[in-house]
Regions:
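N-terminal pre-domains immediately preceding structured catalytic cores
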Residues: 2-8, 14-225
């Protein structure tokens, strides 16, 4: 029985570190966010539209960190991305985390935004995955329906938040890639943010460490219009 209490305590601590408490309101996708091209291409996907586990469905949750409303916060450890709202709330999205996502942390800004982006694989990806140097935009492109390109100090960090053609991995860590969201969720996020939005990428495996807490104080954010 004592081991059960220990497990429950660990779970509660994880929820605290991920910035959410018990209040959770799941959000259905508003179909008005989809443009005609979105509807056309999403209808053509060849991958299986695996339902996202309930824990990683888009939801409005209580949020207790200090980032300003309008900021994006990426919590790689818990596979969540938060869009901070007013009133101690945030929109929480489930994400897939890859090695590239675990390799960078800090504060960035959205420096570019693209609908249905092409994919330019890195030399390592070309060698490892056997993919071409260029993959055109489309329903089965690994970049998915939207991409947010993160910049720091005026330079591209090579860190992206984008859609996916593998929604079955939402809530998981995989061998490569940046931050992936379902195509529907990344469209929703894309429509809520703008160029210059602050993105705080928490240091993996450190939870609410002094480093991450200091980033929270530095993160500015932009109010959602």
């Amino acid at each position: 029985m004592s081991s059960l209490y220990v497990k429950l305590g660990i779970l509660a601590a994880g929820l605290m570190l991920s910035g959410c408490m018990q209040s959770t309101t799941f959000e259905a996708t508003n179909q008005t966010v989809f443009k005609p091209r979105d509807k056309e291409l999403l209808a053509k996907v060849s991958y299986v539209k695996t339902p996202v586990p309930e824990a990683f469905r888009r939801a409005i949750v209580d949020y207790h960190r200090k980032e300003a409303p309008g900021s994006i916060v990426v919590d790689s450890d818990n596979h969540y991305l938060y869009l901070v709202q007013d009133g101690g709330k945030a929109i929480r999205y489930g994400i897939t985390v890859g090695e590239e996502a675990m390799a960078w942390s800090g504060i960035a800004k959205i420096g570019s935004m693209t609908e249905w982006p092409p994919w330019h694989p890195t030399p390592g990806e070309i060698s490892r995955l056997g993919v071409p140097k260029f993959v055109a935009p489309g329903p089965d492109n690994p970049m998915g329906s939207r991409a947010l390109y993160l910049y720091s100090g005026g330079k591209d960090t090579l860190f992206r938040i984008h859609g996916t053609n593998q929604p079955e991995y939402i809530g998981a860590s995989i061998s490569s890639g940046c931050i992936r969201m379902t195509n529907e969720d990344v469209i929703d996020l894309y429509n809520r943010v703008k160029m210059g939005t602050i993105v705080v990428v928490l240091e993996p495996k450190h939870g609410d460490s002094p480093f991450n807490s200091q980033m929270a104080l530095q993160g500015g954010g932009n109010s959602i219009q």
